[in-house]
Amino acid sequence: MELLQDAEFDLESYISAEIARAFGVAEEQAFCVGTGANQPTGIFTANGGAVGVTAAAASTVTADELISLIYALKSPYRRNAKFLMNDATVSAIRKLKDGNGVYLWQPALQAGQPDKLLGFDLVTSPYVPTMETGALPIAFGDFNNYWIGDRMGR
């Protein structure tokens, strides 16, 4: 207690923020790839989720596959949809061009705003699987409809 009182900065707020950050990181990982055993089943590991598009190659994705992924989602859910992927997948996708040699990637016009891919926001997480055989490296959907319930006493 004395340490909290003698600190030259708000140590209590700092500790609270670090604990919240650590919980946030753990929850992000579980919500992406959780196994369902003492943690939520992640959106990339859920058996009930439908795969909209299967890539032709294990380590690449094409513009046509991204377009097919967008339209695999029912139209009511596309309006607020976003892409979710890891940085390695973003790196590969940033290099994709259309038939006229124009990049599909659209950087954000304002600081703090998400980048765009084919007109949709794109967010990243280090916990999304990488592009490899059998992996699901990209999610596209309206994540406002992804409900999370924290239960006490589990």
Model-assigned labels for residue ranges:
Residues 1-154:
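Structured, hydrophobic secondary-structure cores that serve as assembly/anchoring elements
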